[in-house]
Amino acid sequence: MKKFLFSMSVALVLLMSNCHAGNPAKTKDNAATSGSVMVLTNDLFKQKIFNYELNKSWKFEGNLPVIIDFYATWCGPCRMLSPIVEELAGKYAGKIIVYKVDTDKEPLLARSMGIQSLPTLLFIPVKGQPHSSIGAVPKETLEKAIHEVLLVK
């Protein structure tokens, strides 16, 4: 019985590692090309967007415009906005990168960016200052911000 359990454990570990090998970790580049919404942590934010610990004034670290969706799983308007954000990530794949931040899991990041209401979308152009949108807004309004703030057609 012990040999059987040990053999099954080894087989399970090998199977799990093999499954993982077939799914490469999403990076900023394949997020942009695949059109998926990526989860953003505080550490990744400091690396890819803005290191607020090193810089006092805004200095964007990316090379494509970014939308960051600050949300919470318990927030009704956040759940309404989520499919729209997913759709826009697909529509503008390769032109913008879309991230999401669960403010319950990343409270330091939310505080550091001054997020006080949910949902909050942060539109970050390659050059210039970020702009925010608070609340569940229509898709047309978000597309207008993509065109006017992020300068993406």
What do the PLM-derived regions correspond to, one by one?
Residues 73-80, 120:
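C-type cytochrome heme c attachment motif
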Residues 40-64:
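A short beta-strand-turn-helix
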Residues 40, 44, 66-69, 80, ...:
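Extracytoplasmic/secreted proteins, especially bacterial periplasmic and envelope-associated proteins
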Residues 70, 81-89, 93-108, 115:
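Thiol-based oxidoreductase modules, predominantly thioredoxin-like and allied folds used
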Residues 38, 97-99, 130-133:
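Structural signal for short hydrophobic segments within the conserved structured cores
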Residues 63-66, 70-74, 117:
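Short pre-active-site segment immediately N-terminal to redox-active cysteine/selenocysteine motifs
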Residues 1-43, 153:
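N-terminal targeting signals for export/organelle localization
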Residues 117, 122-153:
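Non-catalytic, surface beta->alpha helical segment in thiol-disulfide oxidoreductase systems
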